[in-house]
Amino acid sequence: MDSNTVSSFQVDCFLWHIRKQVVDQELSDAPFLDRLRRDQRSLRGRGNTLGLDIKAATHVGKQIVEKILKEESDEALKMTMASTPASRYITDMTIEELSRNWFMLMPKQKVEGPLCIRMDQAIMEKNIMLKANFSVIFDRLETLVLLRAFTEEGAIVGEISPLPSFPGHTIEDVKNAIGVLIGGLEWNDNTVRVSKNLQRFAWGSSNENGGPPLTPKQKRKMARTARSKV
């Protein structure tokens, strides 16, 4: 096992512990809490994959961070902070929409890279809107927290979420997963639209009818998805 992989996990565990204390002291906002919950699932998956205990890893991570802080000068810290771009948090969904439980009459699940796609194949001939909460850096989607598909009545009929055991994903991973979800929903004659925020930050453009400007490769993937009734 690579030592850098282990030390990275240990530091992430300790930093998560610190962020949890911020939440416990009611010093956090909704986006902060969303990321904390997402990262908790990711750490559990990574711990299982690496065969490491999270509590023990947190203790070692604390020692690593304390050593770094002891050696770090205030001036170097200021320069690092000044050169690091800040990410923004985009919220299509409310806290209620983000945390609501939902059920599928005809459930279907597919793993697309580091993302899990779920949809209800019983939904037919509906107008559906895709909404997502995600972070943005340099005006491009950075990290997807959660994407959900809503009918006009507000029912949740589909979802894309990061897999806890696969830390990290790219903007192309997200766009490919959206293409698969759209293909599966459109198979049953549903009309699917994408939020303006997703269009802007994932594809860098806006389509009046709400459809994402998919690449030919993504369109072919959607077609294969439809034929196989994903």
Curated annotation (Swiss-Prot):
Nuclear export signal (motif): residue ranges: 137-146
The keyword RNA-binding appears for this protein: yes
Annotated region (PABPN1-binding), positions in chain: 223-230
Keywords annotated in UniProt: Eukaryotic host gene expression shutoff by virus, Host cytoplasm, Host gene expression shutoff by virus, Host mRNA suppression by virus, Host nucleus, Host-virus interaction, Inhibition of host innate immune response by virus, Inhibition of host interferon signaling pathway by virus, Inhibition of host PKR by virus, Inhibition of host pre-mRNA processing by virus, Inhibition of host RIG-I by virus, Inhibition of host RLR pathway by virus, Interferon antiviral system evasion, RNA-binding, Ubl conjugation, Viral immunoevasion
Segments for region (CPSF4-binding): 180-215
Modified how: Upon interferon induction, ISGylated via host HERC5; this results in the impairment of NS1 interaction with RNA targets due to its inability to form homodimers and to interact with host EIF2AK2/PKR.
A Pfam cross-reference name: Flu_NS1
Listed GO CC annotations: host cell cytoplasm; host cell nucleus
Region (RNA-binding and homodimerization): 1-73
Localization per Swiss-Prot or TrEMBL: Host nucleus; Host cytoplasm
Ranges for region Disordered: 205-230
Subunit details: Homodimer. Interacts with host TRIM25 (via coiled coil); this interaction specifically inhibits TRIM25 multimerization and TRIM25-mediated RIGI CARD ubiquitination. Interacts with human EIF2AK2/PKR, CPSF4, IVNS1ABP and PABPN1.
The protein's name: Non-structural protein 1
Organism: Influenza A virus (strain A/Beijing/352/1989 H3N2)
